[in-house]
Amino acid sequence: MAQIDFRKKINWHRRYRSPQGVKTEHEILRIFESDRGRIINSPAIRRLQQKTQVFPLERNAAVRTRLTHSMEVQQVGRYIAKEILSRMKELKLLEAYGLDELTGPFESIVEMSCLMHDIGNPPFGHFGEAAINDWFRQRLHPEDAESQPLTDDRCSVAALRLRDGEEPLNELRRKIRQDLCHFEGNAQGIRLVHTLMRMNLTWAQVGGILKYTRPAWWRGETPETHHYLMKKPGYYLSEEAYIARLRKELNLALYSRFPLTWIMEAADDISYCVADLEDAVEKRIFTVEQLYHHLHEAWGQHEKGSLFSLVVENAWEKSRSNSLSRSTEDQFFMYLRVNTLNKLVPYAAQRFIDNLPAIFAGTFNHALLEDASECSDLLKLYKNVAVKHVFSHPDVEQLELQGYRVISGLLEIYRPLLSLSLSDFTELVEKERVKRFPIESRLFHKLSTRHRLAYVEAVSKLPSDSPEFPLWEYYYRCRLLQDYISGMTDLYAWDEYRRLMAVEQ
């Protein structure tokens, strides 16, 4: 196992216009303060205001949005980071691990990774993801990529259909089809900060949001040693070269994760479990009393000093005894959150320290809060109650189905842009209005300038006389559409769908 030295991981250089020379502790901290400013002031963070956590299109301001959730995750991430650094200081490990002058950047990277962790999520969350992937699968049929004979390939896009005698091109076709059918919020987050927003963050800060290490074009089984880290797609073909450079700059082996990402993940796990239950009470899906009984029933028999007793029962008893001064709801969730954090944050911090050799190497193939402990059981309890009583509620399911229909419908509305030939679409991009394509011209005008420029830049770098050019052009055209629709807020997607379907003016 390589020696642990965080100076080799907390890389303060940037992809473009990077600061040069050896920096003092204060100068390095200023570089990460610049990252904070770029992130907090970015439109991607502001759009989280109108993307909801569990309840799409929610008008009740007390129910969490992706932004308020991300701020809560940021606070928990800061708490865990401080706990880790405090324990390392007590053990006299800060200097040994190269952290004695990097505690500020350590905390800042964790905080900003937490704030950014949801920026790539499409409207309507996982149902938006599913809608995008299902729509593209129905047209690209990535499962036919190994079809024999090749004439069995059902792909409806001529440029991406497998052809006899074109094996090198066929392999690229397989990768592109697989990649486009695996849209994922975390991978889109990487694309946002690097390709679309061009935020030029430090290598370490981007490493903090590379949650999964599986390429989106991956086919087949993942290695047993990395099955958790490669559970979902982490980046797209379009960012392959950037991620290769990121790995080099952060000393990451293939399919390995940046150490501070485990802290961001733990902060998210702790935050959303309690938050989803609190939002459900705010939405009157169940009362606090009903929630307590759901939790009690799901946990089962327990001793007086058990974790359930110390966290959930304690919160319930305190909230009832103070019910005259404040509402039982507010009191219960305040105590539940405090009790949960007081148990889970120190546990997550200790797990990080205990497993630091594997975490530093990027190969720890688990979440910090997924093990055989009572702390892990407590998180599972919150998640299971939410799945059983919140996510399966008819109101929630109806909104999710509506969200799926909205995203599918928007993709269908913009499909004419994908149906144009390469030469016709190139003409449309150059002229912005082509008389013989009135519908396509108007659809193209609706696309965001930022996304259109990203497409133009990507395609302009390709050699137009290469046999691969039509494949890559179509790939980036699909990305253009995915970028535009996934970047919408819930409300904008809903309104746009209704307008374009002529439901309202």
Swiss-Prot record:
Cofactor(s) essential for the protein: Mg(2+)
Pfam entry (one): HD
Gene3D superfamilies associated with the record: Hypothetical protein af1432, putative deoxyguanosinetriphosphate triphosphohydrolase like domain
Chain ranges of the HD domain: 66-273
GO BP terms: dGTP catabolic process
Domain of life: Bacteria
GO molecular-function term, one example from the UniProt record: magnesium ion binding
Keywords, comma-separated and alphabetical: Hydrolase, Magnesium
Disulfides per UniProt: none
EC numbers: 3.1.5.1
Catalytic activity, reaction form: dGTP + H2O = 2'-deoxyguanosine + triphosphate + H(+)
Listed HAMAP family: dGTPase_type1 (MF_00030)
Family indicated by similarity: Belongs to the dGTPase family. Type 1 subfamily.
Subunit structure: Homotetramer.
Protein's job: dGTPase preferentially hydrolyzes dGTP over the other canonical NTPs.
Record protein name field: Deoxyguanosinetriphosphate triphosphohydrolase
Organismal lineage: Bacteria, Pseudomonadati, Pseudomonadota, Gammaproteobacteria, Enterobacterales
